[in-house]
Amino acid sequence: MNPNKKNNSEEIMHRVIQKLSTQPWFPNDYCNIASKALLNALKAEGKEVRLQYSYTEKGDGHRFVVEKKEGEETILDPTYLQYDKNYPEGFVGQSFPDPKLEKNRTEEKDFMELQKKRYEEGVYDKFFSGK
Protein backbone atom coordinates (compact mmCIF):
# COMPACT_ATOMS: atom_id res chain seq x y z
CA MET A 1 0.00 0.00 0.00
CA ASN A 2 1.22 3.48 -0.79
CA PRO A 3 1.75 5.18 2.60
CA ASN A 4 0.78 8.56 1.11
CA LYS A 5 -2.67 7.28 0.06
CA LYS A 6 -4.48 5.82 3.02
CA ASN A 7 -7.83 4.24 2.19
CA ASN A 8 -10.84 6.02 3.58
CA SER A 9 -13.50 4.02 5.38
CA GLU A 10 -16.23 4.55 2.81
CA GLU A 11 -13.99 3.27 -0.01
CA ILE A 12 -13.17 0.20 2.06
CA MET A 13 -16.87 -0.41 2.70
CA HIS A 14 -17.60 -0.17 -1.04
CA ARG A 15 -14.96 -2.84 -1.72
CA VAL A 16 -16.59 -5.13 0.87
CA ILE A 17 -20.01 -4.55 -0.72
CA GLN A 18 -18.64 -5.21 -4.20
CA LYS A 19 -17.09 -8.49 -3.08
CA LEU A 20 -20.19 -9.74 -1.24
CA SER A 21 -22.81 -8.43 -3.69
CA THR A 22 -22.29 -11.48 -5.91
CA GLN A 23 -23.83 -13.69 -3.21
CA PRO A 24 -27.48 -14.64 -3.85
CA TRP A 25 -28.90 -13.37 -0.54
CA PHE A 26 -26.92 -10.12 -0.29
CA PRO A 27 -27.76 -7.74 1.40
CA ASN A 28 -30.42 -9.70 3.30
CA ASP A 29 -28.98 -12.09 5.88
CA TYR A 30 -25.47 -10.75 5.27
CA CYS A 31 -25.11 -8.10 7.98
CA ASN A 32 -23.01 -10.40 10.19
CA ILE A 33 -20.65 -11.43 7.39
CA ALA A 34 -20.41 -7.96 5.83
CA SER A 35 -19.96 -6.07 9.10
CA LYS A 36 -17.24 -8.48 10.27
CA ALA A 37 -15.41 -8.20 6.93
CA LEU A 38 -15.65 -4.40 7.10
CA LEU A 39 -14.54 -4.32 10.74
CA ASN A 40 -11.47 -6.43 9.96
CA ALA A 41 -10.57 -4.36 6.89
CA LEU A 42 -10.87 -1.09 8.82
CA LYS A 43 -8.86 -2.43 11.75
CA ALA A 44 -6.13 -3.48 9.30
CA GLU A 45 -5.96 0.19 8.26
CA GLY A 46 -5.50 1.22 11.90
CA LYS A 47 -8.96 2.71 12.32
CA GLU A 48 -10.81 2.81 15.65
CA VAL A 49 -13.93 0.74 15.01
CA ARG A 50 -16.38 -1.53 16.82
CA LEU A 51 -19.50 -3.51 16.04
CA GLN A 52 -22.87 -2.20 17.09
CA TYR A 53 -26.34 -3.75 16.90
CA SER A 54 -29.94 -2.76 16.33
CA TYR A 55 -33.29 -4.18 15.26
CA THR A 56 -36.55 -3.08 13.66
CA GLU A 57 -38.79 -5.86 14.97
CA LYS A 58 -38.66 -8.05 18.06
CA GLY A 59 -36.58 -11.08 17.12
CA ASP A 60 -34.84 -9.36 14.22
CA GLY A 61 -31.22 -8.30 14.59
CA HIS A 62 -28.91 -6.08 12.58
CA ARG A 63 -25.16 -5.60 12.93
CA PHE A 64 -23.02 -2.78 11.54
CA VAL A 65 -19.75 -0.92 12.18
CA VAL A 66 -19.20 2.32 14.07
CA GLU A 67 -15.98 4.27 13.50
CA LYS A 68 -14.69 6.79 16.00
CA LYS A 69 -12.57 9.57 14.54
CA GLU A 70 -11.66 12.82 16.26
CA GLY A 71 -14.35 12.29 18.89
CA GLU A 72 -17.13 11.76 16.32
CA GLU A 73 -18.83 8.44 15.70
CA THR A 74 -19.92 7.43 12.22
CA ILE A 75 -22.09 4.47 11.24
CA LEU A 76 -20.78 2.37 8.34
CA ASP A 77 -23.46 -0.12 7.29
CA PRO A 78 -22.70 -2.19 4.18
CA THR A 79 -26.12 -3.90 4.21
CA TYR A 80 -28.45 -0.94 4.87
CA LEU A 81 -29.87 -1.56 1.39
CA GLN A 82 -32.11 -4.23 2.94
CA TYR A 83 -33.95 -1.44 4.81
CA ASP A 84 -33.87 1.27 2.15
CA LYS A 85 -33.29 0.67 -1.57
CA ASN A 86 -31.85 4.19 -1.89
CA TYR A 87 -28.58 2.96 -0.34
CA PRO A 88 -27.03 0.45 -2.78
CA GLU A 89 -23.58 1.67 -1.74
CA GLY A 90 -24.27 1.17 1.98
CA PHE A 91 -25.02 3.79 4.59
CA VAL A 92 -22.57 6.27 6.12
CA GLY A 93 -23.76 8.81 8.66
CA GLN A 94 -24.19 9.91 12.25
CA SER A 95 -27.63 8.32 12.68
CA PHE A 96 -29.83 5.93 10.72
CA PRO A 97 -32.60 7.35 8.51
CA ASP A 98 -34.81 4.48 9.75
CA PRO A 99 -36.16 5.70 13.11
CA LYS A 100 -36.57 2.18 14.55
CA LEU A 101 -32.99 1.20 13.75
CA GLU A 102 -31.72 4.45 15.23
CA LYS A 103 -33.82 4.18 18.40
CA ASN A 104 -32.78 0.56 19.02
CA ARG A 105 -29.02 0.94 18.57
CA THR A 106 -27.10 -0.86 21.29
CA GLU A 107 -23.72 -2.30 22.16
CA GLU A 108 -22.89 -5.99 21.76
CA LYS A 109 -23.21 -7.05 25.41
CA ASP A 110 -26.63 -5.42 25.82
CA PHE A 111 -27.86 -6.82 22.51
CA MET A 112 -26.77 -10.36 23.40
CA GLU A 113 -28.61 -10.09 26.72
CA LEU A 114 -31.71 -8.90 24.86
CA GLN A 115 -31.46 -11.79 22.40
CA LYS A 116 -31.13 -14.27 25.29
CA LYS A 117 -34.21 -12.79 26.97
CA ARG A 118 -36.18 -13.05 23.73
CA TYR A 119 -35.09 -16.64 23.29
CA GLU A 120 -36.31 -17.45 26.79
CA GLU A 121 -39.62 -15.70 26.00
CA GLY A 122 -40.08 -17.98 22.96
CA VAL A 123 -39.74 -15.23 20.35
CA TYR A 124 -37.56 -17.48 18.15
CA ASP A 125 -39.74 -20.59 18.42
CA LYS A 126 -41.50 -19.77 15.14
CA PHE A 127 -38.15 -19.69 13.32
CA PHE A 128 -37.08 -23.10 14.61
CA SER A 129 -40.45 -24.87 14.53
CA GLY A 130 -40.32 -25.39 10.76
CA LYS A 131 -36.92 -27.09 10.81
PLM region spans:
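A structural boundary/capping signal
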Residues: N2-K131
